[in-house]
C-alpha cells in the first residue's frame, strides 16, 4: 500500500506552479524500480530521468514524504 503525506500531496501543486509536472504513477514507478536507493532513516529512491523520492517503509506500507526533480 502506497500513500502520500499531506506535504507530498501539496508538492504536486508547488511544482506545477513552476511548470514542473509529475504524476502519482511516476512517483510510484520510481519506488517500484529505482536506479539507486539509499537509506538514512528514510529511503531515498532516484531515477536517472530526474526524479528523487523520499519515503518510509513499514512492512507493506510505503509513505511518500516528498519528491523533487534533479538534473
Region locations from a protein language model:
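Ribonuclease/tRNase effector modules and their secretory precursors
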Residues: 1-71
Amino acid at each position: 500500500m502506497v500513500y502520500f503525506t499531506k506535504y507530498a500531496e501539496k508538492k504536486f501543486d508547488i511544482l506545477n506552479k513552476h511548470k514542473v509536472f509529475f504524476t502519482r504513477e511516476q512517483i510510484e514507478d520510481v519506488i517500484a524500480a529505482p536506479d539507486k536507493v539509499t537509506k538514512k532513516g528514510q529511503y531515498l529512491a532516484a531515477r536517472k530521468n530526474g526524479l528523487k523520492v523520499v519515503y518510509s517503509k513499514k512492512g507493506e506500507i510505503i509513505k511518500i514524504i516528498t519528491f523533487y526533480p534533479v538534473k
